[in-house]
Regions:
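Non-heme di-metal
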Residues: 1-225
Length: 233
């Protein structure tokens, strides 16, 4: 695999973030299964929980291969912990619809956006395990699609409306923007634009949830730009 020596640690740290996201998704899907309205949804969520656990192990293996010294690192991302907190609060209220919005639609959308970008880079670098990577990405797409269908069915049945979902999504989307901002130095170290990654997250959202306002990331200078501004002042 043609990964530059100076790219290994940033990519490993990015995978560490994804690993922790997969563990959060695993815990959430198991809790959601207990709230599922029917046996088919329950089976899907339990299957998702198992898949998320496998994904976390896959990311661990990739981290161990790229930068073994960083295996077991905990990403310092207060936004991810805050995301976990408000998601747990929704689970405690038995609010299945909000948890589907937060986990399957928004968080899986973030993961899918990042994985899609990473996959493009890995293909260019002739990375191994292409079939495994494609399966992982397909499963993420399946989880995301499940959440969208569940919410669209709830809207069709009058149990919730798009305006309510957009309002509830605001805090979660703000936190995903903060996560990308916190990782911006990693993106730039592998010649990627964090603003483009943040905007990708919006592209994976359903039309009824997208906001016309640009994400917070697009209004922020990049880490490199910030350093240049400081140097000039």
């Amino acid at each position: 695999m043609l990964v530059g020596h100076d790219e290994k640690v940033p990519i490993a740290r990015l995978l560490t973030f994804l690993e922790h996201g997969e563990r959060l998704a695993n815990e959430c899907a198991k809790a959601q299964a207990a709230l599922a309205p029917d046996s088919a949804s329950r089976r899907f969520l339990l299957s998702q929980a198992r898949q998320e656990a496998v994904h976390a192990v896959v990311f661990q293996g990739a981290i161990a291969w790229l930068a073994p010294k960083h295996l077991g690192d905990a990403p310092f991302l207060p936004a991810l912990e805050e995301y976990r907190k408000i998601l747990d609060e929704a689970l405690a209220r038995n609010d299945l619809l909000e948890t589907l919005l937060a986990e399957q639609v928004i968080l899986e959308g973030l993961g899918e956006a990042i994985l899609t970008r990473i996959e493009e880079g890995l293909v260019k670098r002739a990375a191994p395990f292409g079939r495994l990577r494609r399966i992982l990405l397909q499963q993420e797409e399946s989880h995301h699609g499940f959440g969208r269908r569940m919410l669209e069915r709830a809207m069709a049945e009058g149990r919730i409306d798009a305006e309510t979902l957009r309002r509830r999504a605001q805090d979660y989307l703000a936190l995903t923007d903060q996560m990308v901002l916190a990782l911006s130095d990693l993106f730039e170290s592998i010649a990627e634009d964090p603003t483009a990654w943040a905007n990708d997250v919006r592209k994976f959202l359903p039309l009824w949830l997208r906001e016309e306002e640009p994400s917070a990331v697009s209004n922020q200078p990049s880490a490199r730009e910030a350093k240049e501004l400081i140097a000039e002042s």
